[in-house]
């Protein structure tokens, strides 16, 4: 019935946003947050909601040959590489690499000698349009402002799956593919 369909609309939107998030690699979805490397501890907690870690760096004020060194980017490696490269976490040194340890932590090697300020660049999903709390709801987000065609098409795919109109789903899938390809092209151009 129509009430059942209407109650599913927030679910359609949530699924559409999740799909776009997985398929779109746009730096506009990135966030920068300060982190701290703790002396003697190779594990650093990530900010809440970090989906993809793009970059990790630390800052020093050390002077080499009279020049102040600033931001030092770490190179990304696999966790297996990190523990093989620095297999004694109690030994310390200047960090060179980071790896994703869990969904909420990164692993730094060598283990930092001293406490260092750092920064992490990561992809975070915007607040969902379907997240209503009491009388307020998010009325716009990155997807509704910048990816409206892809969002609408993805919602129509979910709606037609719900009503089991599988032939129409194929039409919306093709339209969605065109809109997401255009967004990918736009995102690629911003990284030049």
Task: Give names to the regions the model predicted.
Residues 1-192:
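Glycine-enriched, solvent-exposed interface loops adjoining structured elements
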């Amino acid at each position: 019935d129509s009430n059942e369909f209407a109650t599913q609309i927030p679910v359609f939107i949530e699924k559409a946003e999740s799909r776009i998030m997985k398929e779109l690699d746009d730096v506009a979805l990135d966030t920068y947050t300060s982190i701290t490397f703790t002396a003697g501890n190779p594990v650093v907690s990530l900010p809440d909601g970090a989906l993809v870690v793009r970059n990790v760096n630390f800052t020093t004020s050390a002077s080499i040959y009279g020049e102040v060194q600033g931001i030092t980017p770490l190179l990304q490696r696999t966790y297996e590489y990190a523990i093989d490269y620095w297999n004694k976490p109690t030994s310390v040194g200047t960090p060179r690499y980071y790896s994703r340890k869990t969904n909420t932590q990164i692993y730094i090697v060598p283990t930092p000698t001293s406490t260092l300020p750092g920064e992490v660049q990561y992809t975070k999903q915007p607040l969902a349009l379907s997240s209503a709390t009491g009388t307020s709801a998010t009325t716009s987000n990155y997807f509704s402002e910048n990816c409206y065609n892809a969002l609408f098409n993805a919602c129509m795919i979910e709606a037609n799956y719900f009503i089991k109109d599988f032939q129409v789903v194929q039409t919306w899938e093709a339209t969605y593919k065109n809109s997401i390809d255009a967004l990918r092209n736009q995102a690629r151009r911003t990284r030049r």
